[in-house]
Amino acid sequence: MKGKQFLTDQSILRRIFLFLFPFLILLIFAFLQILNLMVFQAEKFKTQADSNRILKEKVFPPRGLIFDTNDEIIVDNFIRQDLVVTPNFIEDYSLYLSLLSELVEIEKNTLEQVFYKKLSEIKPFQSFTLLRDLNDRQLAKVKLNFKDLPGTEINSSFSRNVVHGESSGAVTGYLGFASKQDILINPNLKNFNDQQVGLLGIEKEFDDELRGTVGYRYSEKDARGGVLDVLSVEPSTKGKNIKLSIDIELQDKLYKEFRGRKGALIAIEPDTGFIRAMISSPSYNPNFFNNFKTEEIKLLFQNKNSPLFNRAISGQYPPASTLKPFIGLVALEEDVITWQEKILDEGEFFVEGDKRPYTGWKEGGHGEVNMEKALAESSDVYFYNIAYDLTVNSIAPFLKKFGFGKSSDLFINESQGILPDKKWKLGQKGEFWFKGDTINMGIGQGYILATPLQIALAYSALINGGKLISPRIVQSIEGEETKFVSEKIEIKDIQNLEYIKESLISVVESNTGTAKNIFDPKLRIAGKTGTAQVKSILDDNKYQEIRENVLLRDHALFVGYGPVEDPSIVVVAIVENGESGSLVAAPIVQKAINLYEQ
C-alpha cells in the first residue's frame, strides 16, 4: 500500500511541477530582463536620456572678409537674428505655427511649407532654422511670447554685406544654400546645409577658404526645449581673409561709365597678371540674396538682360578688328608679307571662282597700305589678302599661343571662346572648311569668338615681349601672396612685335587712325578698335533695315594700353550693340587708363 501511495504522491508532484514550470520560466525570464535593464542596459538608457536632455548644436563661424588691393573692405559680415526650432519639444505643430504666424506677421501656410519640408529632412531632436533675419518688431514679439513657443530659440548668425553693391557683383558673387548636387561634389558643405555658402564669383571660387570650420555647442534642455545650461563648446574656426587685386574705387567709377548698357571691361597689368577692374554690365547687388525672398530671386534669374552673367569672362564675342594685329604678326612670322610691303585696297576683295566680293568697311577702300597703315585705318581688304595667303592651319595654332580658344582658369564658369579650324567645323557644323572661312577669320569675324579676358591676355602678351600671363584676381589669402605664372611664346623675330606695337600707336596718334578721337599728348595711349558683327549683312540697304532692331546692331570694341612709353595697364571694353568702337568703347578705355595712372 505504501508503494502505491508513494507512486501517487510522485505523480501529483510531477503534475504540479509541469503545471508550475511555465510560470517558473516566465519568472526567470522576467528576472533576467529586469537584471538586464538595471545593470547591462543602464548605460544605454542613460545615453538615450542624455540625448533627449542634451542638444548638440552647430556653431557657424564668420566668413572671411574680402578686401581690395588698397585694403578697403569690399565684403564684410553683419549679425542677423534667426528663429531656430527643435520640433520634438512642440506638442501641437498646427497650434504652434498659428501663434508664430500672428507674432511674425507671416501667413501660416508659408510657415507650414518651410516647417514641414525641414522637418522631413532632420533626425529626432535635431534643430533647424525656420525664419532668418528677424526684424526688430518680430524679434521683440517672439521674445515676449517665448513661454508659449516651446522648442524655440533665437540664434545669432552671420550675413554678408557687399559694401559697394552692384558695381562689384560680377567680382564678389553671392551666397546661397548648397544643393544636393553641390554637397555631392563637395562633401565639406554637408556641415553647412542650413547656412549660405558661395554660389558665384569669389565667394564660390574661394568658398573653402572663406567658409571656415563648424564648431559645436552642447546644451542641457528642459522639457520645453529651454536651455538650462551650456555644458561644453567646441569652437568654430573663422574663415580666411582674402585680398583682391581689384581697385574698388576704379571698379566703381568704370561701372558707372556703362550707364546700364550691356557690356564688359577688363583692366589687367601685363607684367603681373593682376586684374585691377572687372566690369560686367548690367550687374546685380549681391546683398539682394540676403532677403531670402524666393520669388524675387527667381525674377532676377529670369531678367532678360542677364545681370548674373559675367560678360567679362563668359561673354563670347567676335574679336573683329582687334584680332588684326595677331593676323599681321603671324603673316610676318610666316614670311607671307613684309612690314613695308603695300597692298592696294579699293574696298573689295575677290576670290577666284567666287562672284561675291568681300567688302571692306570703307567705301572705295584705303588706297595703297602697308601693315602700319592697314592697322591704323583698320583696312579689311589688306587682311583679306594676307589671310588668303595664310591657311587656318597656321592661323589657329598661332592664336592659341596667345590664349585664344582656351580658358585661363580664372573662374570655374569662364568660357573658352571658339578657335575654329577644319576639325572644329566638321565636328560642329558637319561641313568642310572653305577658303572664305579663313578670309573672314582674318578680320576677326566668322566662327571665331573670344571673351574680353582672352583679348586682354592676348594684348598683354603683345606688349610684354611675348609672355602669356595667367590672370590673378586674388592678391593674397590670409597674408600669403598668390604666385605669378607666365608662359613664354615662341616668336621667330622679336622685331615683328615692335612693328605691331608701332602700328597700335598709329591707331590713336595718326591723323587717319580709327581712334584718333582719344589722342591726348599728356597720356599717350595705343590700341585697336573693333566693330563686331551681330548679324552678317551683305548690302548697305539691308544693313540700315537691320539697324532698326537695336539688338542686331554691331558691338563696339576697343583694346587700349598705356602709357605708350612704359605700358602698365591693358584695358578691353565692349559695349553690346554700341556700333562704334572708336566713339563708344574707346572713351571708356581712355577713362580707365587715366584713372589707373592717377
Model-assigned labels for residue ranges:
Residues K2-L7, V75, K221-V230, D271-S321, ...:
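Beta-lactam-recognizing serine transpeptidase/beta-lactamase-like catalytic domain environment
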Residues M1-K293, Q316, N393-G403, P521-K522, ...:
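Periplasmic/cell-envelope proteins involved in peptidoglycan metabolism and beta-lactam response
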